Regions:
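ABC ATP-binding cassette signature C-motif
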Residues: 1-105, 155-392
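A general structural signal marking secondary-structure boundaries and capping sites
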Residues: 123-126, 145-148, 279, 377, ...
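Proline-centered turn/helix-capping motifs that create local helix->coil transitions or kinks
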Residues: 129, 142-153, 384-389
């Protein structure tokens, strides 16, 4: 194949392959896990952990950073800070440092107020000895190095997801679904159910049909065989990783106002401000936006939809770590039902109550998050393989 015909994941693997074959003393990797499936990421992690040279990585993949790095350098407010350990150690140490500085700040403020009260009281006596004592304390106060209050953690987006109405208990029933493109069979005769309140992650290698499944459920494309049924009062909100739900020729403001004409200009601006679009930025045309900016517009529309069944295709793509954490919080507080495709293992661990792995044209069901999946993967894969052989 020519490289210009390859997918994002295939191009990433080719670039990594060329780089690793040179066996350099230092590797400089910019978002190396982007577009890679879980098996490819696991292989890369193992390679890097056994690599003898130095590795310098820019990444938003928290699970990857936990597995691979031994030191974290953070750029914040124009300054560099260094932390020993992996991402988890960095996150914990940063919080400890902030808590200690905050405690030091409040203790100093309390002491300053106490000394100021004592000085005021001494001066109120209006005696020479008391005034000298007050002046002495004032000089000591002037020599104090003031501790600055630590800045609040930056929360760039702020939003919540709330369904307009409660759906029935049976949200989605998939029966004997099959799909193939030309000679490539994606999945065959698959059946599963999703109940109200479940947060279901779909995982699997690239090209196995995960996104295709979501498009079938959103009636973007048709299945070859089988059917699916939505339950009572189910309303779907769809997040498309390629952002086809957005209109390239519209401005951000028009994207919201055209879909939600009942909103006032102020309400639209307030909504967009929650997703970091302020002032004249709301009049940017969709086609001029970056992937992360399009993602924020799509999330804004998702919030306004008030749907009770969210179907999300790679929702953390192009989001920075702070935005991912805010999205995780919103999804964990969401009272509706979620079905999503993701390669972000940290995100899956934080938000999934169940995992469907697409492997060998069928789905393997795991009742738990990503840690549970890793624990049970070999056992359940063998069980499903045996049942498939018996069916055949």
């Amino acid at each position: 194949k020519k490289t210009d015909t390859l997918s994002g994941g295939q191009k990433t693997r080719v670039a990594l392959g060329k780089l690793l074959l040179t066996d350099p003393d230092i590797l400089l990797l910019d978002e190396p896990t982007n577009h890679l499936d879980l098996n490819s990421i696991s292989w890369l992690e193992t390679y890097l952990m056994n690599y003898n040279g130095a590795v310098f990585i820019v990444s938003h993949d928290r699970f990857f950073l936990n597995r691979v790095v031994t030191k974290v350098i953070e750029i914040e407010n124009g300054a560099l800070s260094m932390y020993m350990g992996n991402y988890r150690a960095y996150s914990e140490k940063k919080q400890q440092i902030r808590d200690a500085k905050l405690k030091e700040y409040f203790n100093q403020q309390r002491e300053i107020k106490h000394q100021q009260a004592v000085i005021e009281k001494l001066r109120s006596f209006n005696r020479e000895k008391s005034i000298r004592r007050a002046e002495s304390r004032e000089k000591l106060l002037e020599k104090i190095t003031i501790v600055d209050k630590p800045q609040e953690a930056v929360r760039e987006m702020h939003f919540s997801l709330e369904p307009y109405c409660v759906s029935g208990n049976d949200v989605l029933t998939v029966e004997h679904l099959s799909k193939q493109f030309d000679t490539q069979l994606l999945f065959q005769d698959v059946s599963f159910e999703i109940k109200r309140g479940e947060h279901v992650a779909v995982i699997g290698d690239n090209g196995t049909g995960k996104t295709t499944l979501l498009k079938i459920l959103n009636q973007v494309i048709k299945a070859d065989n089988g059917s699916f049924t939505l339950g009572a009062k189910v309303q779907i909100g769809y997040y498309d990783q390629e952002h086809h739900v957005l209109h390239d020729d519209k401005t951000i403001f028009e994207e919201i106002s055209d879909d939600y004409p009942h909103l006032t200009n102020t309400e639209i601006r307030n909504t967009l401000a929650a997703f970091q679009f302020t002032g004249d930025e709301v009049f940017q045309v969709i086609h001029s936006l970056s992937g992360g900016e399009k993602g924020r517009v799509s999330l804004a529309k998702l919030m306004l939809s008030e749907a009770n069944f969210l179907i999300l295709d790679e929702p953390t793509n192009h989001l920075d770590i702070a935005s991912k954490e805010i999205l995780e919080e919103a999804l964990n507080n969401y009272t509706g039902t979620i079905l999503y495709v993701s390669h972000d293992r940290y995100f899956i661990n934080s938000t999934a109550s169940r995992i469907l792995e697409l492997v060998n044209q069928t789905f393997v069901n795991y009742i738990g998050n990503y840690d549970y999946y890793l624990e049970k993967k070999d056992e359940l894969t063998q069980t499903y393989a045996s049942s498939q052989i018996q069916r055949q």
